[in-house]
Amino acid sequence: MSGQTLTDRIAAAQYSVTGSAVARAVCKATTHEVMGPKKKHLDYLIQATNETNVNIPQMADTLFERATNSSWVVVFKALVTTHHLMVHGNERFIQYLASRNTLFNLSNFLDKSGSHGYDMSTFIRRYSRYLNEKAFSYRQMAFDFARVKKGADGVMRTMVPEKLLKSMPILQGQIDALLEFDVHPNELTNGVINAAFMLLFKDLIKLFACYNDGVINLLEKFFEMKKGQCKDALEIYKRFLTRMTRVSEFLKVAEQVGIDKGDIPDLTQAPSSLMETLEQHLNTLEGKKPGNNEGSGAPSPLSKSSPATTVTSPNSTPAKTIDTSPPVDIFATASAAAPVSSAKPSSDLLDLQPDFSGAAAGAAAPVVPPSGGATAWGDLLGEDSLAALSSVPCEAPISDPFAPEPSPPTTTTEPASASASTTTAVTAVTTEVDLFGDAFAASPGEAPAASEGATAPATPAPVAAALDACSGNDPFAPSEGSAEAAPELDLFAMKPPETSAPVVTPTASTAPPVPATAPSPAPTAVAATAATTTAAAAATTTATTSAAAATTAAAPPALDIFGDLFDSAPEVAAAPKPDAAPSIDLFGTDAFSSPPRGASPVPESSLTADLLSVDAFAAPSPASTASPAKAESSGVIDLFGDAFGSGASETQPAPQAVSSSSASADLLAGFGGSFMAPSTTPVTPAQNNLLQPSFEAAFGTTPSTSSSSSFDPSVFDGLGDLLMPTMAPSGQPAPVSMVPPSPAMAASKGLGSDLDSSLASLVGNLGISGTTSKKGDLQWNAGEKKLTGGANWQPKVTPATWSAGVPPQGTVPPTSSVPPGAGAPSVGQPGAGFGMPPSGTGMTMMSQQPVMFAQPMMRPPFGAAAVPGTQLSPSPTPATQSPKKPPAKDPLADLNIKDFL
């Protein structure tokens, strides 16, 4: 098996003959040679993903086809090639993979061709699961965690808490799938698995950086959150600590395999006192004690603009203070009153992309009173803590109410000294709370060892190892392994576990410390608070449902797509949207801001927001909540015209919310069978304009919110009432008995502006579709025979099985029509509906929607007449269209109108 086999050459030659250079390159990259895919073939494929005329689905299909080979070498190389393209190729590639319902189905793969095949098959199964998870998380988030910006103004650091709480479990699931690869150094025995391991290693570094940013963001905002959110955040933080241990083990394997130490970050655990502080805060919230949750009366030096004593509960955080008050110390007494702005100083667990501006001012910054001491609880990984050490005497934690008794130097003081009355206390905390920092900070018992850039008087042996780690390049620099970052900025370089006493790390470079005082853009900060602070409107709902929220968050991460379903929608018009999707991207502009549904029985609907469900969760709030109907969701002209952000009245019953949120088009769902059963409630009117960019909505005037039966016929311009969905009056759920219209009703509905369709419905209603066989002069057309076979079979009782909103199964909808079921199920339709599966079929509610993804967005396929149980796949091939009569065969061509006049 050393070289290419004959079959490899034949396959490549076949594709050469057919002229498919891309498929040929895929074959060349996945030969039977036991070595990683050759760089020239990978580069060719990467270049191909950037070409506009290359068929990405065909490339992916060829890779999937190679992954069905019986040889572990070919399969493994197909996986490595796919992973390489997901990471380095154009985003169109991973976007397409995310749109597919199935990717690699290798959970049972086994190559029995030798002991090596058995061993490698195990890793193939794990690796394929990770790649599936990677595509799935892209589908849910609409971005790739490994590609997004990291650091102080990165995506995870600036994300609003509601969205953050939903994103973190998705990220945790992806990291878990990666860690399950679980390889030992002695198993990395060939070039194929080595190539896979290198890709996984690089992914893990980027994913963990994102994870770290998310945790920093959570901790910054922890003291402003409501009780339910605090519970979720604490749970996420606990999981983070356990995953850190597993990540460290993975990185040890990488080190043993010979990956450059400079590329491997050192991880240091946060002090346990941090966890205690968080738990104490949560207990205070649950105990409903107002005021200072930490029990210290002195306001934090940083929160002078709004003293802690004025705040009764974190829920009442004033929205106005976000821009003016300096970042609050995260351990401040409940002073959520001074909301933590998203300025960089407020904490860097792993400051991944440090900014180099203002370096000269940085050395003095930490000693400046409150505003300058904005590093408060500190750039948790920021190097400025070292500078702080050199300039501040170490008797700092004088008034630290939580400081333990004098302890051996190994213990760090509790970071709760936010209430310290002196600035020095604050700065000292900066040095000690380095959750993961390089800050080998001196404990209270020892003098600062050295200033930034100098050499330490005595460096213990373990520290030398850490220095070695420091001197490498920055693993998070934008380009792979680029060495542009200053050596001391390897931001994962941390305290080695062996050190008995923390010591300041001397670094070879004399670059000044990063000041970490550049504030990130104000709009982001405003958007973030808009989302957090206005959430108080639904505090009552959250209180009653926080238990449910907690269970959702604790579910397996792969399914816990949007953990806390009960966050209330922001009320500031369109403020959070630019934050979530600045470029009106077609994936998920508002998929994460859901109005609270109170006790509405839909916890699983959190599973259904998908890549394209633009506003899937902006369903109308039930009457139990205090927040108004979501008017602001229309502020952005979504690609689907905000089809699902309905402005229906608040008095709708809770089932209404269920229907509109769950049924509203998770265009890409299809993973897992755990989606909820459809309810037969009517659809809110806002869903009728599925593809109409609602201009009233865009300018802030939500269409009539008074009654949910107000329906704008102009949505179906030019189609008469033929395709108009049946709307039940005033938002009442339609009783099942009124669903199948009588033949007379269907006939009257059918008399639209389209003569052919009207006549077709008359034929169905009058039941004389068979009469033409009596006419001898029409026999040459053989019309009736065309209606009898297979997919074209048409029952005589059709009037009872299709409601007025869906054309009869024998007719072809007009080419200009919007499929009436594309956005929602037609009302209670028992038979061949588009949005709702008939009872008894295993089809999930969303199964027929994915057809819309891989095609141009404004040209949905006709799915209206789908046969019950048909599972549509997202690839836009004719085979996936619902079986119906070809346009050429007019069902009325052989009928004489005189027959039924």
Curated annotation (Swiss-Prot):
Keyword Protein transport: yes
SUPFAM superfamilies in the record: ENTH/VHS domain, GAT-like domain
Omega-N-methylarginine: residues bearing it: 859
Compartment list: Cell membrane; Membrane, Coated pit
Keywords: Cell membrane, Coated pit, Glycoprotein, Membrane, Methylation, Phosphoprotein, Protein transport, Transport
Pfam family of the protein (one): ANTH
Pro residues bias spans: 512-522
Record note on modification: Thr-310 can be modified by the addition of N-acetylglucosamine which can be further phosphorylated. There is no evidence for direct Thr-310 phosphorylation.
Protein name as catalogued: Clathrin coat assembly protein AP180
Native species: Mus musculus
